[in-house]
Amino acid sequence: MWIHFAPLKIPFSRRLQTGAVLQWAVSFLAMAQCCIALYILLLFSRYWYLAVLYGVWLYIDWDTPSKGGRRSNWVRSWTVWKYFAEYFPIKLLCTAPLDPKYNYIMGFHPHGVLVVGAFGNFCTEGTGFSRLFPGLTPHLLMLPAWFRVPFFREYIMSGSLVSSDRSSAHHLLSQKSGGQALVIAVGGPPEALDAKPGELTLQLLNRTGFIKMALTHGAHLVPVLSFGENDLYNQVNNPRGSLLRATQEKLQKIFGIALPLFHGRGVFQYSWGLLPHRRPIYTVVGSPIHVTKTPCPTREQISSLHSLYIAKLRDLFETHKGNYGIPEDRSLVLC
């Protein structure tokens, strides 16, 4: 396979964009492991007392990721995130105003390989979330295990990431002042195994937990479609029923995270690497579905709202797909 090298002469701004995405990729894929190693090294060094002090802090602060986290507007507004968003570029599009008097559950679709669009739009100000949705505080849900990693937890919480456990969602959606927006990648890690260029397969038909949560708390539902999310990485072919897919699904059940075999581009060449390709992401936030608080929803109520949500998501896709290069005969694939 021929390697397609990047040209030597490119605008400095593009180098800054690549650097911004490189630091994100390293943070996403390796920072947690490095933080664990750093803590162990610190524990067995002459500065062991610092590790002990941090361990005490970790014990005291253990539940913070389930109680709204510890966001930092300063971190969210770093200039690096502007370059991160410009790399693809990522665009956040508002189709209807969201009244900050209410709390919301935003269903983000698709998950993609590394949830790039959700991070860029809701964990940073790189695409201007606060300008588009004044009065709303976004919280992207992430697997609880990541918040047990020393040092790494502080970094991810600063960007509005919170634990995805039930108590975390309950805490945020119980805020009577409103203005809380929970962002849930509904398909979860399993959906990453279907994240391939040109495809849009969503795991949604059996996902009703977020629907019940919305009813229980009276949180309005907002479908969000991120066009281009699946085009950022190439993935080894793993059709359902294949040995590779069965192995991936088994490992996902054991470890709780998906393990897609993917590749993108490198820093100095476009053929292979862990950086995502420069392909646009258009994240379209749909109109809110108003939900009446129902503390003990029945199966029929959950099913009815779930069907309405799917219908609104399909409408959002059909309305906007032509704007982003998707053929008119293409439909969402739900499983």
From Swiss-Prot:
Pathway assigned to this chain's UniProt record: Glycerolipid metabolism; triacylglycerol biosynthesis
Enzyme class: transferase
Keywords for the protein's UniProt record, in alphabetical order: Acyltransferase, Cytoplasm, Endoplasmic reticulum, Glycerol metabolism, Glycoprotein, Lipid biosynthesis, Lipid metabolism, Membrane, Transferase, Transmembrane, Transmembrane helix
Coiled coil: none
Keyword Lipid metabolism: yes
One of the record's GO molecular function terms: 2-acylglycerol O-acyltransferase activity
Positions annotated with a glycan in the UniProt record: 206
Catalysed reaction, written as an equation: a 2-acylglycerol + an acyl-CoA = a 1,2-diacylglycerol + CoA; a 2-acylglycerol + an acyl-CoA = a 1,2-diacyl-sn-glycerol + CoA; a 2-acylglycerol + an acyl-CoA = a 2,3-diacyl-sn-glycerol + CoA; a 1-acylglycerol + an acyl-CoA = a 1,2-diacylglycerol + CoA
Stretches that traverse the bilayer: 24-44, 104-124
Localization terms from the record: Endoplasmic reticulum membrane; Cytoplasm, Perinuclear region
InterPro entries: DAGAT
Keyword Ligase annotated: no
Pfam family, one: DAGAT
GO cellular component: perinuclear endoplasmic reticulum membrane
Major subcellular site: endoplasmic reticulum
Membrane topology: Multi-pass membrane protein
EC assignment: 2.3.1.20, 2.3.1.22
Family affiliation: Belongs to the diacylglycerol acyltransferase family.
Physiological role: Involved in glycerolipid synthesis and lipid metabolism. Catalyzes the formation of diacylglycerol, the precursor of triacylglycerol, by transferring the acyl chain of a fatty acyl-CoA to a monoacylglycerol. Plays a central role in absorption of dietary fat in the small intestine by catalyzing the resynthesis of triacylglycerol in enterocytes. Has a preference toward monoacylglycerols containing unsaturated fatty acids in an order of C18:3 > C18:2 > C18:1 > C18:0 at sn-2.
PANTHER family reported for this sequence: ACYLTRANSFERASE, DIACYLGLYCEROL O-ACYLTRANSFERASE
Name this protein carries in UniProt: 2-acylglycerol O-acyltransferase 2
Gene responsible for this protein: mogat2
